[in-house]
Regions:
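Short beta-strand edge/turn micro-motifs at domain boundaries
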Residues: 145-147, 151-173
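Surface-exposed, polar/charged faces of alpha-helical domains
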Residues: 55, 90-91, 117, 188, ...
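Low-complexity, intrinsically disordered terminal/linker segments enriched in charged
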Residues: 166-200
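Early exported N-terminus immediately downstream of N-terminal targeting peptides
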Residues: 32-108
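Surface-exposed, charged secondary-structure patches
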Residues: 106-146, 196, 200
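N-terminal secretory signal peptides and thylakoid transit peptides that target proteins
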Residues: 1-18
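Boundary at the C-terminal end of the N-terminal hydrophobic targeting segment
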Residues: 27-31
Length: 200
């Protein structure tokens, strides 16, 4: 079992940094052109899945594969654990990353299913202090278009996205708050969280 010291203050620090203080592997520069191509590929696959007419279960499986190919899941998983990462063993971190990949792909896959009948259109790029932001617009039936931003970096020898901001909601910050709340609800037992997270 892992103790949970000062979780509220830790979350506050994460919010203050705006999600920029990621942990994990070193980061190399990624060009705007490479980041744009990466997100264009991601968006093309997402659009193909939402237009496929498959069942929800089939779509969620497809979205898990998309996250595998396009997201820096280890970096995201390490960030959302916050200081709990320091107390976890290597085996726990590996197991959590695997469980979190399924959880986040299903969660955002369900969000992307809301785009059925519409599409995501890439509109531009800009360089950030860390990585590149690729901006897109989600054009859906029956509602006003809204912005979706992808933050892309090269931390594993190729471009990968490490954050998504949908209608102003920052994935890294909201996921850290949610994962730490889930861990609290399980008495700080990381192994229990790992076992239950894919079904959450």
């Amino acid at each position: 079992m892992i103790t949970l010291p000062n979780r509220r203050s830790v979350l506050g620090q994460g919010l203050a940094f705006g999600g920029a203080a990621l942990i994990g592997t070193p980061v190399w520069a990624v060009s705007e052109a490479d980041a744009l191509r990466h997100v264009q590929g991601l968006v093309a696959e997402v659009n193909a899945v939402i237009a496929s007419g498959q069942s929800e279960a089939q779509m969620l499986l497809q979205f898990e594969g998309i996250f595998d190919r396009y997201a820096d899941v280890p970096t995201i998983a390490g960030y959302v654990l916050g200081v709990e990462r320091r107390s976890a063993s290597s085996a726990q971190l590996t197991a959590f990353t695997r469980a979190y990949k399924t959880y986040i792909a299903r969660k955002y896959g369900r969000r992307f299913r809301e785009f059925i009948g519409g599409e995501v259109q890439v509109t531009g790029t800009r360089t950030l202090p860390r990585g590149v932001e690729v901006t897109a617009i989600a054009v859906l039936r029956g509602r006003a278009p809204f912005q979706v931003d992808f933050h892309v970096e090269d931390s594993r020898g190729r471009p990968l996205f490490f954050n998504i901001i949908i209608e102003g909601i920052n994935m890294l910050l909201s996921e850290r708050a949610e994962i730490l709340a889930l861990l609290d609800s399980k008495g700080g037992d990381l192994n229990r969280l790992i076992a239950e997270l894919p079904q959450t």
